[in-house]
UniProtKB/Swiss-Prot annotation:
Pfam families: AP_endonuc_2. Belongs to the FrlC family. Homooctamer. Can use Ni(2+) or Co(2+) in vitro, and, to a lesser extent, Fe(2+) or Mn(2+), but not Ca(2+) or Cu(2+). This is Fructoselysine 3-epimerase.
């Protein structure tokens, strides 16, 4: 089972610390968070991409994916006027360009909250328009685009496996995939494995965390309530061969290396001995 480190937790340290820690602690790859000060797409375009490529080479650490910040601060393709929507889409396109240049395996985005007063037909119409434009761009440059479902605490657009199916049906692009952050189904009493049943080969990536079942908080494995050992055995039995990013975000920023080590050790302890 291949593991990835998410760099978001290192955002108060130089990004080289994330590459160094991923390498020294034994992660198989790294998922780059696209926010300042580390890897904001416009900053990469202005020259910062050279550092990212150099660090990947120095530490021999594959960049499994690039995840620009699209949950509303300041970019949210699902909310705001046409100028805001256009700015968000342009940023995501630039992120795909940067992902391509850093040889990332995918660009991962989400459909953030569309606003409490927005009716469903407007939400889904806007999502379809956005994804259609982004997928056309992804197809032109040869980049896989992953749409991440969020928890209902974060969004009212794509939050479960059926929402993902709807989005994929609206925009049937060979470059559009999805994934599952296992916190999202767990807090909605949705079986995690239903994503495997429903999405098939459109399920491209996993974010592994623990959950309290009542919030979008991402815990280190073992700190929440999820039956992770049993879940991982089911995932292995399904033949999943992609990466699992252990997605520590902002809760552990005071000691990212220590918690990244602990998270990886606990994750590996969940796996059968032959994995």
């Amino acid at each position: 089972m291949k593991t990835g480190m998410f760099t978001c937790g290192h955002q108060r340290l130089p990004i080289e610390h994330a590459f160094r820690d991923a390498s020294e602690l034994g992660y198989d790859g790294i998922e780059i968070w696209g926010g300042r000060p580390h890897a904001f797409a416009p900053d990469l375009k202005a020259g910062g991409i050279k550092q990212i490529k150099a660090l990947a080479q120095t530490y021999q650490m594959p960049i499994i994916g690039y995840t620009p910040e699209t949950n509303g601060y300041p970019y949210n393709m699902m909310l705001g006027d046409e100028h805001m929507r256009r700015e968000s889409l342009d940023m995501i396109k630039l992120a795909m360009d940067m992902a391509k240049e850093m040889n990332a395996g995918y660009t991962l985005i989400s459909a953030a909250h569309a606003g409490y007063l927005t009716p469903p037909n407007v939400i889904w119409g806007r999502l379809a328009e956005n994804l259609s434009e982004l997928c056309e761009y992804a197809e032109n440059i040869g980049m896989d685009l992953i749409l991440e479902p969020l928890t209902p605490y974060e969004s009212n657009v794509v939050c479960n496996a059926n929402d993902v199916l709807h989005a994929l049906a609206l925009v049937p692009s060979p470059r559009l995939f999805s994934m599952v952050d296992i916190c999202a189904p767990y807090v909605q009493a949705e079986p995690v494995m239903s994503y495997f049943d429903k999405l098939g080969d459109k399920l491209r990536h996993l974010h592994i965390v623990d959950s309290d079942g009542a919030s979008d908080t991402h815990y280190i494995p073992g700190e929440g309530k999820m039956p992770l050992r049993e879940l991982m055995r089911d995932i292995i039995d399904r033949g999943y061969e992609g990466y699992c990013t252990v997605e520590l975000v902002t809760m552990y920023m005071n000691e990212p290396r220590l918690y990244a080590r602990q998270a990886l050790e606990r994750f590996r302890a969940l796996l059968p001995e032959d994995e």
